[in-house]
Structures are given as C-alpha cells and as structure tokens.
C-alpha cells in the first residue's frame, strides 16, 4: 500500500480520536470544572474593563479587579432586589384579587356539578343497572383498576414532590460553594490574565496559538451577538405584550409584560407558562372575550418569535438564516428545548473553525500537505 495513504489513515484516526477524547473529557470533567468555566467566562467579560481602569486610574490591578467585581455583584444584587420587590408587589395584588376569583371558580364548579355532572351520573347509574351481571362486574373491575392506577400515580407524584424539597435545600450549600469558588477563580484569573495568557503562548505552538486566538475572537463575537439577539427578542416580546394588555385594559400591564419577557427566556417554560393557565382560568370563569383577547395576544407572541428568532440570530451571530433555522430544528429534535440553544452554539463553533482556517489546517495535516 502507498505510504501516503497509510499516513493519511493514521492521521485521520488520530484526529478523530483526539476529537472524541476531548469531547468525552470535557463531558466527564464538567461536574468538577464548571465553577472555573463560569469564572473564565466572567473573567473574559470583565478583564477589558479592568484593563481600561488600569490605564485611567493608575491603581494596582488587584484594586481595580476588586472594584469591578464589587460593582457587578452590587448590580446583580440590585436586579435581584427589584425582582423580589416586583414579586412581593404581585403577591400582594394576587392576595387582594384572588379570593373573589376563587369564590367565583368554586361557584362555577358547584353549578357545573349540579347541572351537568350529577344528571350524567344518574343517567350512567340507570344504564349500569340495566346491564347484565357479568358486564357490571367487568365495569367495576376496570374502575377499580383505574382507581388503583390513579392512586399509585398520585402517590408517586407526591413522593417525587416531597423528595424534591430536601434536594432543593441540599443544593443551597453546593450553590453557595460554587458561587464562592467561581468568584475567587474570577478574581485570580482576571488579576493574572496577562500572565496566564503569556504562559499559554510560551507552552503552545505558534500555529495553535494563532488559531486559538482567532477561534476565541470569533466565539466571543458570536456570544456577544447571541446575547444581543436574545435581548432584542425579549424586548420585542415585552413591547407586544404591553401593547396587547394595554388594549385589553389589563391592570399592571407593564409589570406583567416585563415578567413574561423574562419567562420567555427560559427554555422549558416560555411565555406559554403564563398565557396558557391565564387563558384557561378566564375561560372557566366565563370571561370569554378576555380569554379570546389573551389567546390572540399569545398567538401573536408565538408567531413573531418563530418568524423573527432565526433572522435576528443569524444577523447577530453572522450565520445564514437557513443554516440557523436548520440548527434550531435539529437541536430541538435531538435535545428538546435545550437544543434551541445547543444547535446554534454548535453551528457557531463550526463557523468559527471554518472562518479562522482551523479546519483547513486540520485537513492539511491529514493530507500531509506542507505549509
């Protein structure tokens, strides 16, 4: 066999093995390294600010890093305080307005029982009495089976809910530890950013350093674009919801629009977690015009999200809209709602490798081409 083909085969095998090994190592080490990955992301965000303060203030870098971290912590605490205040205000509003609605709902259930369920029960009882003995026994057996199954499922659901309570409290110390380690790692990474960068330049080959720098720049640009795109999408959702609720004369339209915009960011929940129960409640309590109005508003939010998300994402991260749409669909089919984030992220990484010429470098290595 030709020597070059053997070399190509083994180099291809080496590249595939290294790629698979890197993915496996990243996957299995993630539970141990994710606080430091968070720190790396935070450090990459704040170090330009620290560099600017180094030039302007002339203070030691340690003081500038502490100042920037303190500012970000205070900003996060401020946002959290505002959210808690909004939740408290909303809870007080619900405590004032819910009792009459609950009373209306109970009255509706009583009316439904007396006008529909009880007559239906009487009719079914008459039909049951007209059946033969073996048919009655069969129906009773099926009802008992359904009852046992429902009781079993209800017990399992209750046990899962009760198990989640100690798990939640057990997560609090771990969350606090992760937060502390992430902040400490962010401080040290940012303080020694240039030293660590120089150390990596000395350790890694020039070609790897150049490609890594280019890929990092592309990924940073894409990440910034992704955050901007999400901010734009949330803002559009908030504006549409605010206008719709204002037209429907719903109280606290601004607060509700703000909360729906934030919930719309969550992959598993989305705006539907607010709209769907709201529409059901309005329908049950007989407020059909309001329910139809909220339903139309929900459809408008859904349609605008589906139409604008691929276009805004593609424009922000510099990827073709069709490729973005394919990535969103493939990610959703493979990984569910989390795939809506994972799909574009993988596409961004592939795009970064193509743009920076890293794939070309790998291909040149495999095909034994000299540069």
Curated annotation (Swiss-Prot):
<keyword id="KW-0472">Membrane</keyword>
<keyword id="KW-1133">Transmembrane helix</keyword>
<dbReference type="GO" id="GO:0005886">
    <property type="term" value="C:plasma membrane"/>
</dbReference>
<dbReference type="GO" id="GO:0055085">
    <property type="term" value="P:transmembrane transport"/>
</dbReference>
<feature type="transmembrane region" description="Helical">
    <location>
        <begin position="334"/>
        <end position="354"/>
    </location>
</feature>
<dbReference type="InterPro" id="IPR014227">
    <property type="entry name" value="YtvI-like"/>
</dbReference>
<feature type="transmembrane region" description="Helical">
    <location>
        <begin position="256"/>
        <end position="276"/>
    </location>
</feature>
<keyword id="KW-1003">Cell membrane</keyword>
<feature type="transmembrane region" description="Helical">
    <location>
        <begin position="30"/>
        <end position="50"/>
    </location>
</feature>
<dbReference type="InterPro" id="IPR002549">
    <property type="entry name" value="AI-2E-like"/>
</dbReference>
<keyword id="KW-0812">Transmembrane</keyword>
<keyword id="KW-0813">Transport</keyword>
<dbReference type="Pfam" id="PF01594">
    <property type="entry name" value="AI-2E_transport"/>
</dbReference>
<feature type="transmembrane region" description="Helical">
    <location>
        <begin position="168"/>
        <end position="188"/>
    </location>
</feature>
<feature type="transmembrane region" description="Helical">
    <location>
        <begin position="65"/>
        <end position="85"/>
    </location>
</feature>
<comment type="similarity">
    <text>Belongs to the autoinducer-2 exporter (AI-2E) (TC 2.A.86) family.</text>
</comment>
<protein>
    <recommendedName>
        <fullName>Putative transport protein YtvI</fullName>
    </recommendedName>
</protein>
<feature type="transmembrane region" description="Helical">
    <location>
        <begin position="225"/>
        <end position="245"/>
    </location>
</feature>
<feature type="transmembrane region" description="Helical">
    <location>
        <begin position="6"/>
        <end position="26"/>
    </location>
</feature>
<feature type="transmembrane region" description="Helical">
    <location>
        <begin position="312"/>
        <end position="332"/>
    </location>
</feature>
<feature type="transmembrane region" description="Helical">
    <location>
        <begin position="283"/>
        <end position="303"/>
    </location>
</feature>
